[in-house]
Amino acid sequence: MIDSATFFKRKHCILLAVAVLAGCSTTAPRTVSEAPTPVTLPAATYAKAAWSALPPVSDSDLQAGFVAWRSSCTRLKNDAVWAKPCATAAAVSDKDPAAIRQFLQRDLDVYALRAGGHQADGLITGYYEPIYAGSLTRTDKATVPVYGTPDDLVVVQLESLYPELKGKRLRGRVEGKVLKPYDDAGTIAAKGANAPVLAWLTDPMDLQLLQIQGSGRVRLADGKQVRLAYAEQNGHPYRAIGRWLVDQGQLKKEDVTMDAIRAWARANPARVPELLRSNPSYVFFVRNPDSPEGPRGSLNVPLTAGYSVAVDRSVVPLGSLLWLSTTRPDGTPVVRPVAAQDTGGAIAGEVRADLYWGSGDAAGKLAGDMKQKGNIWMLWPKGVPLPN
């Protein structure tokens, strides 16, 4: 009898062979690659709950969360799960909290998310759209390249042959007739990539944090800004640089924030390359037109500050409406509906979300300090089977 780990590895091997023979042509997805996770979740991951079990929200948060979620319908209008609720929601006034509540309670059921089938508390973090100084050409100060998708990067969608592996992808490059792992971040930093350079930054830490956030802007010398969004990833697992600092005895676990990591980097410039090599994952970007809207997440709709979240799509399908209960770093309650519109390499697990806080330094401070406990409920269309 084959155990699940061996079976999963064999599937990878079979698919690699098929992919190479087929030429490995595919369209680059927007989702962030994650290390393999179990594809079958316990049924108790989704625990049916009553509407009365949800913590109350203000009318303003209800309206803002509804509007953020409804923007997902531009991508979901033909989706088997969400087409009907989206069609109904189009006629609901976002100025009428009572009408929004009526729609939600009539069309959607409530399911509490449970880690391991029983644990209600999970981790809620934050992210934002950073703005960094840079240039469109290399200069004496701007020497750190931001790469677009490499020409030789191959992406294999596992679900094309194995539906139960939905959302899982392999990435690499073809050498001869063999698909090999793509270069890790350290190799790319040392040797470069076979990819266009979209912009140049002044600090390698800026690039690392840009990759962690998944999108950002480059502020040019003339004041104009270039918007960058996640395009692809090199296929290597994400390793938190904060964890490396803890393992090295440089920071205490409870002290790890973006500000603390940057302060360490400024105090230890000679060790910054070592720090960056500890995370083999490398994100490639695409230039997007500048816009007052938020950056586009994995669902390819603009993110809404405070009301869009990144999730583990193997648990929560993109486009889902969630009810979030957590706190800000200062303890202020955050209770609101949020839209699952993005993914992230570090976002894995049943009760796990990354809340988008907006653009710039203030949003960055809030996002960087946020490591809160929280509870999540999924609002799922009535009569529709739960995700597998």
Regions found by a protein language model. Name each.
Residues 2-14:
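Bacterial N-terminal signal peptides that target proteins for export
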Residues 20-23:
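C-terminal motif of bacterial Sec signal peptides marking the signal peptidase cleavage site
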Residues 13-16, 46-49, 120, 277, ...:
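Short, functionally important structural connectors and interaction interfaces within domains
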